[in-house]
Amino acid sequence: MQHPHGVQPWGNFLLNGGADIRSTGLGQLRVLSDDLLLTVLGLLPAKVLLSCSATSKALYCFCNHEELWRALTLQEFEGSFRYSGSWQHTYLAAAGLTEPGSQPSCGPLKVQGLYSDILYQPWFCATTPIREEWLERDNLERRSGLSLEDFRQHFELPNRPVVLSDAAKDWPAQKKWTRKYLRKAFKGQAVVAGNYPMAFDDFLAYSDGATDDMPLYLFDCEFAAKAPKLATDYKVPEYFAEDLFGVLGESARPHHRWLIMGPPRSGSSFHKDPNATSAWNAVVRGSKKWILFPPHITPPGVHASADGADVATPVSLVEWLLNFYDAAQRGGVRPLEGVVRAGEVLFVPRGWWHFAINLEETVAVTQNYVSSAGLPAVLAFLKTGRADLVSGCAEADRADLHERFVSALREQRPQVLESC
């Protein structure tokens, strides 16, 4: 496949030579790096950006870069848009500059002689097929019919991941949660996708048409309040029934459960779960590829600050797979990885780095929790008093979360507090 504007990676110029239209096409802007040029263009309003795109073939390619129009759309309209095949056309329709649902009168202009990794790479990551070698390795332990004691002794206490292959297979959600059912459940409600409130039908339209290298995906911690019947369609697996944050009450505890839905290639880049909690993730429809590293091994390509407050990762999940998956296999500690499918539940222990990419449109439920086994780690984390590291609750409630949690435990679960 060829980039829609004919842009090629910089390596092609180094290998093959030929004309380079960048310098002549950018004029005095040629002194700027591609990255800095896009930053400058990102400061322009849409109409100026369109005018600039008509000045030269080189600027045409930069000004039509999809990431610029995605940023403009989300900045100006947040989630109030209907995706229309490209981010530029989506913006123009949302701004009333074109008719909603109309198609561009002509296709994209293809140029020759423009070489830019920053323009080429997002398109390449969005269109390159998911490779079989990224999926074939499966060394996650899988168990069915596991007793509570076996789970505790073999997985929870040693802090080891496991796929519980039958933990969600009998949920009503497995049969109920079709698009039609979810559309009805969320009627009149906005869901959260990419941190923006969006009508559920608009999210589905985006999901069907998105060509992003890192697609937006639905990640909503208030789904049960917005669509109460969804909360009755699943049951917390017995292995995770103890959740000590519950002593704070639903309104005072950190956010702990989310509905997740997204198109292929959407998902979450490497991170550790908040507040030193453990988590479980149940796939209702679709499938997810998971990669996990133990707490003391930072994944290749990931750069974390000493306190964990800041984590830098590649922009897209496919970019990490392209650039770092092979390196991960050659490292001293290989990751645990595998595909989790509908009806299966992955236990993600506290502190583990994890990455998940949807292989198809996928719907899942995930919850973070604090068990007796995990309580010492959570209390130690909260005791630091670092409000900037606490997440899932109002900023004003973060600094004293440790104090409030201990007080509630002392009143409601004193034996657990004494034994930790």
Residue spans of the language-model regions?
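N-terminal accessory scaffold of Fe(II)-dependent oxygenases
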Residues: 2-38, 42-345, 355-420
